[in-house]
Every structure is written in C-alpha cells, then in structure tokens.
Amino acid sequence: MNFLRKILFPVAFVYWIVTWMRNYFYDKQIFKSKSFDLPIIAVGNLSVGGTGKTPQIEYLIRLLQDNFKVATLSRGYKRETNGFVLANNSTTVKEIGDEPFQFFTKFPKIKVAVEANRINGITQLLKLENKPEIILLDDAFQHRKVKAGFYILLTTYSELFCDDFILPFGNLREPSSGKKRANMIIVTKCPSDISELAMSEVKKKLDVDVPVFFSKIVYDELVYSEVKPIKTAEIKLTEKTIITGIAKPFPFISHLKKENDLVLEFSDHHNFTKKEIDNIKELAKNKTIITTEKDFMRLKGSLSKEQLFYLPIKSAFLKEADVLDKIILDYVEKSSRNS
C-alpha cells in the first residue's frame, strides 16, 4: 500500500458511501432497473481491470453458440465512435474497441455490438430481423440500469475482492457487499496445482451462498500471425520483442520471456500512436514481435505480417466445469421458455 493511497483514505470513505447508497436505492427499487424478455448474462467484477473477463466471455460463447443465437454487448472502451454500433465485415477495431473486435473476429456465428447505454444497446439488438436469443453483457456488474437474469462475478485468486478496499484507497469499484448480486462466482487465474484445501479456504473467505468455481489461464501451444502459426515452445527460444497493453501483464510476460528479450509495456487498451509504432519498428528491427491477442487487434496493419505474432489464451476450469455448464444452460433454457 503506497503513501498516496493512504492519504486518499478519506476520499475512499466518501466514495464508499456514494456507491453503497446507489446500490441501496437500486435494491429498494427507488432507482429503477429495466428487464428484458430474453436471457441476459452479465459478466463483471468488483475491482478495476485484470480479472480475465475476455477469456470468460469467450468460454460462454463457445458453450452457447451452437444451440442459441448469441450476441455480446460491450461499452467499447477507448473506441473512436459513439452510440450503438453493430459489428460487420467492414468494421474496424477503432470503431468498436479491441475486445469486441476480438469477439467478432473469432466467432463469426454471433452478433457483436457496442453501446455505453446498455438499455439502448439491448433494444437495438432486439430490433434486428435475426435478433439474438441470449445476450452476454461484458463488464456490466455495476451497470444496474439493466436487470440481467444471471450475474457472474469474477475475482482473481491472488487479489480476492474480500481482501481489497474501495477506490482510491484500494481497487474496488463498489463495496464488497455487492457480491450478493452474483448468481455465481469464478475465481480466475488460479495456479494449476491449487489444492482442495486452498479452494476451501477461498470459499470460506468469500462467504457467499452461491456456487464458486476455480479457473486457470491456459496458453495456446501455437502463436499466430496473419501468415502462419509457430509453436509457442519454438518462439520462446528466439530473441524477441514482447508488447503488452493489458491491465496485469506479468503472467503473460513471464510465460514467454527469456533473458535478452525486449519488453514494451503499455496501459490497458492502449491506442498506439504513429510515433510509438515507429519506435517499436526501430527497437524490434528484424526480431519477432509477440503480443497478446487483444493487442494484436490494434497492432495488425501497422507492423509487418511476417514479424507480428500473438499468443491466445483460454479459461479452463480446474474442476466441476460440467456443473458450471449445466447451471448456465439450465438458466438459459428456463429463461427462454418463460420469454
């Protein structure tokens, strides 16, 4: 805990009161939430960034897309457009943001839309001729103007929300009591060898009455480019430049880095300027450049196709994935029947 955060404690206390009152007014229906007549799953967290929302949304897409018409709705963080945008084949990453662009690129079966006003976003999606049967709301745990039918709360194993405090003293967007809105909690970025005892201790600390699942990040065995894939084990041995623009890059970097590699770290969702691209070209020269899948969406077209690669990740559950899948599918099927 640094000195600046200590002196900001009074500000955090005021922020805690404001966010608590906001939730209280929604809970008591003084502030109104809008419901929609279809299954809506909201995925989010209580803390700021880096909990692994993107691979979790992708897990849900893979689970649902073969049997349901799926749409994702995101705010479109750092995009250069306003209002509702539905992705199509001419859409660019600048128009919808890196994460939605990644969804659109990887999952051609689904609809991908962005809109900061989620009520309007859902309304526009439901006006489509081939409208979705289920909507996944990305980073929407605090977006209480919409009442989703199912809430998935994410928290990282190394930074549980129950050990944190409200901004700016800590990293929480709202008091940890917000956990009571969750229908399910997923503890992300767990070590592969986590013990049953450690899982039990985490569940006890979280102190919730909903199912708790544990997931880890799995790195692909291949790194990809617009030209050809290469084995990850092979590229680890080469001297390379690693570029990240994500919230918590250390695991990604440590998975790939060897002693002489150059690492360039940028802020989360960073929009690269021409000067920065030119600097990357100069520093990397003829070396392989490897980045995250999200950053690749923003860097491709600016760097050499032969030089630029990305390493995909997935969310994998350490146990009871079938139980989680059944809970989600049961909700969707039951909600669909009632709509």
Where on the chain are the PLM-derived regions?
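Residue-level signal for inorganic ion chemistry
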Residues: 14, 54, 103, 138, ...
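Short, flexible loop segments at boundaries between secondary-structure elements
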Residues: 220, 267-270, 306-334
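Phosphate/Mg2+-binding loops and adjacent switch elements
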Residues: 77-79, 83-205
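C-terminal accessory "lid"/substrate-recognition subdomains
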Residues: 2, 160-288
